[in-house]
Amino acid sequence: MSFKNKLKDYFMGDEYEYEYVDEDNQSEEPTQKEAKVNPKNVVNLSSVQQSNSRVVLIEPRNYNEAQEIADNIVNRRAVIINLQRVDHQQAKRIVDFLSGTVYAVKGDIQKLGAETFLCTPDNVEVSGTITEMLYEQEEYDKGW
């Protein structure tokens, strides 16, 4: 062996020499800190959702305001829409657009009156029904 190799082996060790590490096959038991669960981190989600529930009343004047209504539904707010100030064709387009929005968030849309609708996201539950007593021919022909 050359002097260089001897010096290298002295400081670096022999390249064929391996270190053996004795490993215990015993599994380590978890410490108390790991096993202990902090009960203060548990939050009841239903109470969080109920505290932020809102109902928004909107009376659109044209189809362009449908996006604002849809944004409220996507943000998990119930919306009551009064379509009395919109002509029938635009009102029908608004209802169609909102029906798609409500479907996307797994919500519900209900007719409350002749030109009034309630759109709710999935976090709002509506109970009860409203029935119309008299049907005027004009309202019946609108095709809601």
Curated annotation (Swiss-Prot):
InterPro entries: Cell_div_SepF, Cell_div_SepF/SepF-rel, SepF-like_sf. Pfam families: SepF. Coiled coil: none annotated. GO terms for biological process: division septum assembly; FtsZ-dependent cytokinesis. Keywords: Cell cycle, Cell division, Cytoplasm, Septation. It is found in: Cytoplasm. It comes from the Bacteria. GO terms for cellular component: cytoplasm. Its main location: cytoplasm. Belongs to the SepF family. Cell division protein that is part of the divisome complex and is recruited early to the Z-ring. Probably stimulates Z-ring formation, perhaps through the cross-linking of FtsZ protofilaments. Its function overlaps with FtsA. Homodimer. Interacts with FtsZ. This is Cell division protein SepF. The gene is sepF.
